[in-house]
Each structure stands twice: as C-alpha cells, then as structure tokens.
Amino acid sequence: MNMIGTFIKPMHPEGRKFVAIFAAVTFGLFLLTPILGWIGVGLTVWCYYFFRDPERVTPARPGLVISPADGVVSLIEPAVPPAELGLPDVPLTRVSVFMSVFNCHVNRAPVAGEVTAVAYRPGKFFNASLDKASADNERNSLAIRMEDGRDLAVVQIAGLVARRIVCFVKPGAQLGRGERFGLIRFGSRLDVYLPEGVSPQVEIGQTMIAGETVIAELGTGVHTDQNKGELHG
C-alpha cells in the first residue's frame, strides 16, 4: 500500500474536469483505433500527474520563508513589487521560481499572515523564465502581512503554455505557512518579494519544493547583487 502511495498522489479538485475531458476523448479515440486510444491514455495519465497535490512537510521553525512553488530558481534580483498591491515603491529582493509542465503546480503560502491585498492583472504570455514576464505577463499578486507587521508579496505569473491562474483566497484571509492558496495550469512562475533587508538563502538553478524548501530567514541581513542573473528554460 505504501508503495502504491509513492507513485499515486492525490489530485487537486481543479484537475478533475480536465482528467474527465481527457478520459472522454480517450474513449472516443479507442473507438477509432487502439493506437490513438493508448496515446490518449498516456495523455490522461499525464494530466492526472500534472494536477497532483502531494502532502508536504513544512518546517516549523519560526522566521522562515518557504518556497511557494515546485520548480527551479530562475532569477534573484532587486525589483519593485507590483504597483497594484499598494506596497511602498521600494526595490526588494525578488526570488523567481520557474515551474515547467512537469512540476506540481499547486501554490503554497511562503509565510503565515493575513492576506491584505489580492490583485489580478491581465497581460501577455511570454516564456515565464524570462525577466520581462514579471512585468508583462498575466499575473495575480498577493500581499501577506506577517505577525511582526512586515509585508511579503507573492505573485503568480502565467507562462507560455499556462493561460489560467487560480487563487483560492481573498483579502482578510489568514494563511498558514505552507498552506495552499492557488495554482497555475500548465507551466508558469512564482515571484516572492522578500521584506526589506532579508537575504535569500537559495541560488539560481536550485531545485525548489513548495511548502518545504527554505528561501530565506526573516532575520538575515541585506541582500547583495552577487546572485543576480537569469536562467532560460
């Protein structure tokens, strides 16, 4: 039973209708030819895998910022948070996590706190690994106010394939660290804007696990630009 659980993960409810559609199309393909039917089976399994929602063990130690997404760190650089959040117009350290179509796309809160703002903005669909995706692509931004009064911003960004951002929370909601707050369908990116003076503890190219990998400690010092760069994928 444990071995089965290793390979078969729970599926997020957002994926049920997509798997149902893939399964229905697969049935039709089998009526045409078994070869197409088996291709449909493979695509249906992939769709189920894409919407998997495994449990995660979030570190309990206070003062940690946790990755909101599975994927790879593609950018670390200073940037001003999205204007629609109403945060101060001050550059903060932005850590970007790029998710391929093979990553789990359920998004988790990097810190615990109150959601003070949720702002959706339509946009383009450039490759999410590019720097300009933060400014130009469709996005949904959240501001989270922590217990100490500091704010952290996390931004869901649609990518070249992803065309649908889903957010489960509204302003006033209380989030626990590692709690699910949304997902992005079929490839995308998450940006985390660390509070002023907080340094990231990750590097470009590092693999991230949502709800588990530590991005930063809230007590760390000022960030330098030595890690600034870009990863193309």
From Swiss-Prot:
Residue positions, PTM Pyruvic acid (Ser): 188
Gene Ontology biological process terms in this record: phosphatidylethanolamine biosynthetic process
Name of this chain's protein: Phosphatidylserine decarboxylase proenzyme
UniProt organism field: Ruegeria sp. (strain TM1040) (Silicibacter sp.)
NCBIfam families in UniProt: PRK05305.1-1 (NF003677), PRK05305.1-2 (NF003678), PRK05305.1-3 (NF003679), PRK05305.2-5 (NF003685)
Cellular component GO terms, alphabetical: plasma membrane
Domain of life: Bacteria
Cofactor note: Binds 1 pyruvoyl group covalently per subunit.
Pathway(s) the chain acts in: Phospholipid metabolism; phosphatidylethanolamine biosynthesis; phosphatidylethanolamine from CDP-diacylglycerol: step 2/2
Stated family: Belongs to the phosphatidylserine decarboxylase family. PSD-A subfamily.
The keyword Lipid metabolism appears for this protein: yes
